[in-house]
């Protein structure tokens, strides 16, 4: 991380890698379990679409405001204890939204849910970057692949619970009760980084370094495309190509599965091509996918387009976090800056797609997604490793 740290009883790199990968999977599983029960919460509280949309803004607000605190917490308590506590809070928060008695309570609980998610997100990415740097080869794509796999596993459990008519309050409480100790045990193998006594604590709130904001702009393009595709692909298939509900749902499955598979395989590609060439190639694939979506007059073409979008953007955010680890004297602060920008993109994307669709068409909305994917091709150079940084990839990328 930085020169002003010492590691106490640091575990072997293999053990640390497995531990952080498990943490990513647990974090993703929380997301997957919750996402599948949103319709239950909507029906239970008799919310309109607008009220639900308002409530679902609060996790992103909570995450964006809390993320800058993660670095200070890690400095105060050490990386392993901070990750263990933040992940436990995030897992425990899973049980709370379904218990909300009304809209105001739901907004407040989702704010806390998002805040704990964001801080845990920064902590686990900071430690993932630390392990990657010490191993001297790319692992961040695989870690985010484990997050995607955890999301798919959590969503499968949630779908089974919903299909079986299980009350979401019971389902999410049981899921939280399982995930809290699982996450706690996983953190036992995480790196334990303690600041030296003379090391200055990072400020509670501070702007990240400019280089982190530039890296965040690349992440913004990728997460905008991801958020737009995840939230709107099924609607696009139904409204534009006339797909049935089942076929429309398949477009989401194609997108999510290709993203997960690409992330799990992405480290090998990064090691061979380097981060710049990998993101440029992915950006080109995403542009092709976006053009297929925009031009689609048949369901297979649109589904193929969304799948290519998933492949193209899959490794961008992991590589942005890896680059942020070198973007300033306090890696956790730079990572928090990148994470905040990407969370903002995830918040803006679904609404922006809806606004453009209302003013013009869904096809025009995904024209914007295609333009942002092209931005990955143009801006990938900001991810080039700094001079002297140890990488296991070609120096040109």
Regions found by a protein language model. Give the residues of each.
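Helix-loop-helix hairpin linking two adjacent transmembrane segments in secondary transporters
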Residues: 143-194
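Intracellular juxtamembrane helix-capping segments at the cytosolic ends
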Residues: 118-134, 314-329
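Helix-to-loop junctions at the C-terminal end of transmembrane segments
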Residues: 66-79, 162, 262-275, 357-358
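Conserved MFS/SLC helix-loop-helix module at the cytosolic interface between two early adjacent transmembrane helices
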Residues: 65-104
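Interfacial helix-cap and linker-helix signal at transmembrane-aqueous boundaries
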Residues: 41-42, 73-74, 160-165, 237-238, ...
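C-terminal transmembrane helical hairpin of 12-TM major facilitator-type secondary transporters
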Residues: 273-320
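Helix-breaking motifs and short loop linkers at transmembrane-helix boundaries and internal kinks
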Residues: 46, 78, 99-104, 242, ...
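Short amphipathic helix-loop junctions that connect adjacent transmembrane helices
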Residues: 36-50, 231-247
